[in-house]
Amino acid sequence: PTWLGAREYCAWRGRRLPSEAEWEKAARGTDQRRYPWGNRLPTRAQAQFGARFNDTAPIENFSGNASPYGVLNMAGNAWHWVSSAYRPYPYRADDGREDLTPGPVRSTRGGGHDSPADEITTTQRGRTLSRNPRAGHHNISFRCAKNE
C-alpha cells in the first residue's frame, strides 16, 4: 500500500497511522529492548529476515515475537508505514516530522523480509523504500493506532 492509502484505510476504520515514536514504544516497551521479544537475535520461528526478493510470509507463521505490550510481528517480513516524516534523530515532535501533508519522505519501521537479522530491531528506521508517499512497495505494510 501507499502511505496515503494506509492513512486513508486507518481513517476509514476510525484510527490513524502511529507516529514513529508511538511505533517504537509499542515495539520496545520501557526496557529499551533491541527486538520486540528481547535482546537475542531472531529465530526463523519469530520473524522473516534475510530472505530473497518478494519473499514475505504469512504472519501466522510466527510465534514468540510479542512486544512488551503484546503487539505481534513488529520486526521483519515487511516494513511498517508510520505517520512521521523522515527526519534525523533525536526525535522532536515540534520539528515538522508530524506534519501530515503528503509531501515529505515518510519513515518506515521494523525492517523487511530481506533485512539482515541484526537490522530488524526496534530502532531500525527506513526511508529508501518510502521516498514517495504516493508509491507503494511490496515490502511495506502498516498497522493502525487509536487514541485512548
Where are these regions (language model features)?
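Short, structured beta-strand segments at or near domain termini in extracellular proteins/domains
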Residues: G136-E148
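Functional-site microenvironments in short loops/helix caps that host divalent-cation chemistry
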Residues: P1-L129, G136-H138
